[in-house]
């Protein structure tokens, strides 16, 4: 496996995180690999990891991982969520979703399974099959361990599950440590309250016990687990807005301030961190949200869900959210969490995964172009040349979804002869504007014809 020898050389180290080695001035094999993938200098990647602006989620128990970077210096990344529920799916279906997500360009995948069989077996199968980083939300399995009875949850239950996930090879975990008991009254004026599953569990626990969030009070113990396996924090935004009305409110920003404090606490132990963000945010507030996160969290990579820019399109929320995601990426968000057409409606199937992922690959790519990332537009230019030259097969190859592009073309013109035709079914053979080729000789003749003629002298 790719990383087996790299990992073996670190055996016995108390801290095996990429941040720890980067702060020692070392360029690890993972750093070099990411630098090559991103066409960046290895020293730049190392310095960004050391600073905390870039993370490389790479658990030492995930040896078949192909390392990738998440940060402002790298391409804008896309995460795909999969996972079985008590009402739908199973291990085989989730592994198939993983393979589909990787095929269509997911940079990371989160297993959000809450049921549907043996959660440990599902997670293990996904990690073993995955070349991309895998994330989880350990609170879900912690709740299952007490049969859904939130009041019976203990810090020990939660820490045991976190360590189990780390030992299995999970590369990053959503840890909802930022929601504090004093934040709960701030949700009173909301339309949709708390919409984070993990945050909702912890809110109910705090209300039942009148005690502080156990993930907050035991944060240093989680740090100690993470540095043993190089697990990255994905600090969860439990109080993210669940609708336009609730965006950018006091509850959201109170938690964000705490997430910044936790980020810096993890950094003191050389543990990698990214910070999760909203959610549902109107377009005119997205830039402010990104800037505020950078300020509060000392430029730790920002990882946002959408955001959805309107709430009135169930069944089309891959579109409402991709609009917000493109803007968030442009303003500096490091990773976008995809949303599928099934959002708010049901568990996504394989086709939903494909549709949501392609929408988000478009958003991330558009953000890279807008950010002026070197080489970001190269593929666009190459596809445009193929389009202008009626090289249909090359157009399909360069598409984000080659199968869908070919399928749509072939609905009306399936015969092979039309793969070299200088038209498609939209314009037909007589009206395609790209048949108009203006060469240099034609331009020279045109310029000569338009050149003012000398006026004859009058006698």
Curated annotation (Swiss-Prot):
Which Gene3D superfamilies does the annotation name?
A: 6.10.250.620, Radical SAM ThiC family, central domain (3.20.20.540)
Q: Which organism is it from?
A: Gloeobacter violaceus (strain ATCC 29082 / PCC 7421)
Report one GO cellular component.
Answer: cytosol
Pathway given for this chain reads: Cofactor biosynthesis; thiamine diphosphate biosynthesis
Give the protein's biological function.
Catalyzes the synthesis of the hydroxymethylpyrimidine phosphate (HMP-P) moiety of thiamine from aminoimidazole ribotide (AIR) in a radical S-adenosyl-L-methionine (SAM)-dependent reaction.
Provide the reaction this enzyme catalyses. Answer: 5-amino-1-(5-phospho-beta-D-ribosyl)imidazole + S-adenosyl-L-methionine = 4-amino-2-methyl-5-(phosphooxymethyl)pyrimidine + CO + 5'-deoxyadenosine + formate + L-methionine + 3 H(+)
NCBIfam families in the record: PRK09284.1, PRK13352.1, thiC
Would you tell me the protein name for this molecule?
A: Phosphomethylpyrimidine synthase
Name the encoding gene, please.
thiC
| Record keywords | 4Fe-4S, Iron, Iron-sulfur, Lyase, Metal-binding, S-adenosyl-L-methionine, Thiamine biosynthesis, Zinc
InterPro entries documented for this protein: ThiC (IPR037509), ThiC/Bza_core_dom (IPR038521), ThiC/BzaA/B (IPR002817)
What is the free-text note on the cofactor? Answer: Binds 1 [4Fe-4S] cluster per subunit. The cluster is coordinated with 3 cysteines and an exchangeable S-adenosyl-L-methionine.
Q: Where does [4Fe-4S] cluster bind?
A: 424, 427, 432
A GO MF annotation of the entry reads: 4 iron, 4 sulfur cluster binding
Any one of the GO BP annotations: thiamine biosynthetic process
Q: Which HAMAP family match?
A: ThiC
Q: Which residues bind Zn(2+)?
A: 280, 344
Q: Which domain of life is it from?
A: Bacteria
- Homology family: Belongs to the ThiC family.
Cofactor(s) the record lists: [4Fe-4S] cluster
Q: Give the EC number(s) under which this enzyme is classified.
A: 4.1.99.17
């Amino acid at each position: 496996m790719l990383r087996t020898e790299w990992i073996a050389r670190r055996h016995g180290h108390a801290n095996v995180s990429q941040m720890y080695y980067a702060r020692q001035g070392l360029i690890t094999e993972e750093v070099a690999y990411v630098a090559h993938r991103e066409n960046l200098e290895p020293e730049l990647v190392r310095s960004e990891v050391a600073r905390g602006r870039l993370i490389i989620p790479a658990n030492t128990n995930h040896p078949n991982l192909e390392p990738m970077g998440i940060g402002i210096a790298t391409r804008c990344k896309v995460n795909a969520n999969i996972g079985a529920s008590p009402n739908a799916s199973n291990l085989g279906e989730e592994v198939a979703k993983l393979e589909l997500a990787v095929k269509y360009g997911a940079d990371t995948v989160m297993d959000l399974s809450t049921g549907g069989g043996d959660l440990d077996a599902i997670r293990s199968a996904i990690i073993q099959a995955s070349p991309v980083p895998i994330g989880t939300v350990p609170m879900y399995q912690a709740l299952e361990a007490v049969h859904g009875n939130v009041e019976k949850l203990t810090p020990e239950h939660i820490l045991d599950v976190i360590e189990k996930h780390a030992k299995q090879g999970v590369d990053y975990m959503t840890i909802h440590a930022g929601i504090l008991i004093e934040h709960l009254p701030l949700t009173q004026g909301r339309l949709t309250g708390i919409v984070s599953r993990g945050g909702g569990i912890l809110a109910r626990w705090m209300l039942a016990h009148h005690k502080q969030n156990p993930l907050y009070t035991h944060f240093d113990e989680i740090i100690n687990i993470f540095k043993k396996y190089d697990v990255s924090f994905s600090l969860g935004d439990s109080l993210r807005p669940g609708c336009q009305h609730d965006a950018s409110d006091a509850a959201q920003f109170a938690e964000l301030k705490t997430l910044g404090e936790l980020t810096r606490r993890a950094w003191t132990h050389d543990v990698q961190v990214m910070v999760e963000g909203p959610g549902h945010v109107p377009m005119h507030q997205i830039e402010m949200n990104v800037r505020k996160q950078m300020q509060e969290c000392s430029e730790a990579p920002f990882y946002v869900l959408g955001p959805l820019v309107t709430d009135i399109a169930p069944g089309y929320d891959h579109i409402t959210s991709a609009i917000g995601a493109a803007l968030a990426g442009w303003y500096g968000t490091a990773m976008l969490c995809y949303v599928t057409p099934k959002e708010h409606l049901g568990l996504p199937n394989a086709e939903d995964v494909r549709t949501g992922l392609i929408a988000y690959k478009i958003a991330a790519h558009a953000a890279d172009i807008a950010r002026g990332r070197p080489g970001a537009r190269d593929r666009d230019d190459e596809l445009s040349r193929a389009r202008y030259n009626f090289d249909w097969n090359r157009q399909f190859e360069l598409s984000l979804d080659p199968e869908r592009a070919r399928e749509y073309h072939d609905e009306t013109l399936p015969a092979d002869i039309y793969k070299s035709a200088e038209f498609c079914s939209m314009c037909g053979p007589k009206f395609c504007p790209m048949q108009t080729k203006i060469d240099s000789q034609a331009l020279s003749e045109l310029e000569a014809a338009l050149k003012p003629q000398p006026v004859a002298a009058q006698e």
